[in-house]
Amino acid sequence: MATATGKIVAVNGNMITVAFTGAVAQNEVGYAVLGDKKLMAEIVRVRGSRCDMQVFDATTDLMVDDRVEFTGELLAAELGPGMLAQVYDGLQNPLADLAKEASKISKDAEFFLQRGMYLSGLPRDRKWDFHPLAKVGDRVTAGDFLG
């Protein structure tokens, strides 16, 4: 759900300048809408009712007046079981899974990252064994082994 919206007023390489309505914050994630694709970007500077955003995909075909949707969430990485078995890109997309999904679109797609394609960083369809060593109410500190 978009918390704020905006329109692109300038494109320069992988940077876009956006005039927005609503509240936004530095490091907030937004998406530049390009047809049926949404290109992930992060706010790197806010100046009044405009912000500069770094787009994490090719900005080819983005134009002035294209729509931008802001998420109200900061750029973050998800932590949990299964991370050590994956190879990720800078947005925590698991590259092997991304290639598999992309190859469904085009045979050539498995060699190149597809614009606007993002996957969950951790597998949601797996169960992980966890044997807790700490109990509810135990006082824990940094470095404690919980299980």
Please give the residue ranges for each predicted region.
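Peripheral, non-AAA+ core regions of ATP-driven protein-machinery
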Residues: 1-147
